[in-house]
A protein has these predicted regions:
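Conserved Rossmann-fold NAD(P)-dependent oxidoreductase catalytic core, especially the SDR/UDP-sugar
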Residues: 32-76, 96
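NAD(P)H-binding glycine-rich loop region in Rossmannoid oxidoreductase-like domains
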Residues: 1-29, 55-58
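Alpha-helical membrane-targeting segments
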Residues: 113-138, 183-192
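Glycine-rich NAD(P)-binding loop of the Rossmann-fold in SDR/ketoreductase-type enzymes
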Residues: 22-33, 79-80, 136
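Substrate-positioning beta->alpha
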Residues: 109-113, 127-150, 156-160, 171
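Conserved beta-loop-beta element that borders a ligand/cofactor-binding pocket
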Residues: 85-106
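Mid/C-terminal beta-alpha module of Rossmann-like enzyme folds, strongest
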Residues: 148-192
Length: 192
């Protein structure tokens, strides 16, 4: 095909110059370096690591994670986050780990995109829209972080801070439509 037409075979490939091991270095080695540096200047400090729900892996349908399950990450991102958790647990400082899910609220641009699309009457979802999700409001996560860093009962524990209700991506799409005053067409986007 013609160059730039989008037709025919690709003539090259895009590469951002980032390698998988670089991501591991940030999540694992970066967390360890910070813990060691803080340990040198403030050996009694508490390390509060913000990880990700992806480190835990998926829950069984209809059964949200409790936090006591062994981690089973299924993505490279989740495995990187788990590697960071492991070095913090083995590190020199008392620790607390939080595994937040999707965060929404002030300054969030990802969920904001869904609201903008809903204003046009469109709400994309992956697959059939039955993917179960959990979320936390940004200011609620901030409160959880403060509690994790100050409560004497949190040391050595891993928390899954989230809204107690699990919802589907289709329900989220319809709820966003309601919030912007539109009936939305929920469009199924193929999962990759």
């Amino acid at each position: 095909g013609e160059r730039g037409s989008g037709r025919g075979r690709p003539r090259g490939r895009a590469h951002a110059g980032v390698r998988r091991r670089d991501f591991f270095a940030v999540n694992r080695d970066g967390a360890l370096a910070i813990a060691r540096a803080v340990g040198r200047v403030a050996p009694d400090a508490r390390f509060v690591l913000v990880s990700s729900l992806a480190a835990a892996g998926p829950a069984a349908r209809g059964a949200p994670l409790s936090g006591g399950e062994p981690p089973r990450p299924v993505t490279a991102y989740g495995r990187r986050k788990l590697a960071g958790e492991e070095v913090v647990r083995a590190g020199p400082l008392p620790w607390v780990i939080l595994r937040p899910p999707m965060v929404y609220g002030p300054r969030d641009t990802e969920v904001l995109r869904l609201f903008r699309l809903a204003r046009w009457g469109v709400a994309p979802v992956f697959g059939r829209g039955d993917q179960e999700l959990s979320a936390i409001f940004g200011p609620d996560l901030a409160e959880a972080l403060i509690a994790a860093g100050t409560s004497p009962h949190t040391v050595g524990k891993t928390y899954l801070p989230c809204h107690p209700e699990v919802f589907t991506s289709g329900a989220l799409a319809r709820q966003i439509g309601t919030a912007v005053g539109r009936d939305v067409l929920v469009l199924s986007v193929p999962e990759v």
